[in-house]
Amino acid sequence: MGPRVLPLLEPGCRPQAGKWYRMAPRGEWPRGRVGHGCLFVPGGSGRVLLLGGADPAGAFADAHFVELGAHLWAPAAWSGLRPRYEHATFLSACRPPRLWVFGGAHRAGNRSCVQVLDPEIGTWESPEVTGIPPLPRTFHTSSAAIGDCLYVFGGGDKGAEPVKDQQLHVFDTVALAWTQPDTHGDPPSPRHGHVVVAVGTKLFIHGGLAGDIFYNDLFCIDTTDMKWVKIAATGDVPGGRASHSSAVFKDHLYIFGGIGPDGTLDTTYKYHIEEQQWTLLQFDSPLPAGRLDHAMCVIPWRVGKNGDAAAVSKEDKAEPTASAGDRAGHLCRGQDKKACTEDTMMHLLLIFGGMDTQAEIYRDCIVSLIE
């Protein structure tokens, strides 16, 4: 089943609560893909980075930006990334931030290497690291870093089987070193396709898959005391799922989609971190197509002076191809004088790509208002 036709959200328009929209940035769209990284990159009006991923022909080594201010797709003219999908993507906390990747898979198998982008020359480097790295694995997340460190738990081995590893691995991007700190309490069982989300000093792990078992449990570890806690959440607790997406905004964690025992999912939940309560979010039709192995992030959305005009469904106009001058250069740019002011800002969940259980690869860019 192909993507359902969602209303188009035009630049500057005010989205309505409880609705899904599609975005149609100008320029040359990236190919549909699964297992890609997805990050919001601050600076100016902000940009969304899509990195790597795969389709049935193989793994990708490309990167693309959505320029939110210009509403434009722009390829990043970088080189040297080893093709990979279902990898970890993260920005370190140093200034300026640096873009890193870890793990993932390609046609020949899983990876355990890290790479970092040199933003001055646009080249991916493979630094020498010390310590014991994790076993090669898939580990699909863009939200598992705290400060300058990436936290790795679980991941995929082969097929539906996870790596048999319940150790927490920490990669320090400053020291270029892997460590395995001692933890307390019972860790989650081995799994892959789970979401890993950093909130302050805490890591939350939800769901995942091992063989034919779909998990619906929620764990937390505070990196200040390294104690695992299984959370007895309340409310509309989501059923077991894997390969779903996640994002955090203020005091809520959001998840969308994934796959469960009965197939792909098109539901969205939010989890109140302090109250430990799940809520199933309700949306008007049409809903996005259910999907797995997609990626999601939170973006700011500027509502213009005429922003109360409703977003409408219409046929997209033919879009021009991005010129060489539109190609993304530096990762983070300086503040734009026309950057959004606080009173005109809203925030959206943005999702790109994914697939269904019939191996249809999605190429859509969909958004929904965070209330």
From Swiss-Prot:
A Pfam entry, by short name: Kelch_KLHDC2_KLHL20_DRC7
Kelch repeat placement: 47-93, 98-144, 149-201, 202-251, 252-301, 348-371
Domain of life: Eukaryota
Record keywords: Kelch repeat, Repeat
Signal peptide: none
Role description: Rab9 effector required for endosome to trans-Golgi network (TGN) transport.
Protein name: Rab9 effector protein with kelch motifs
Organism: Gallus gallus (Chicken)
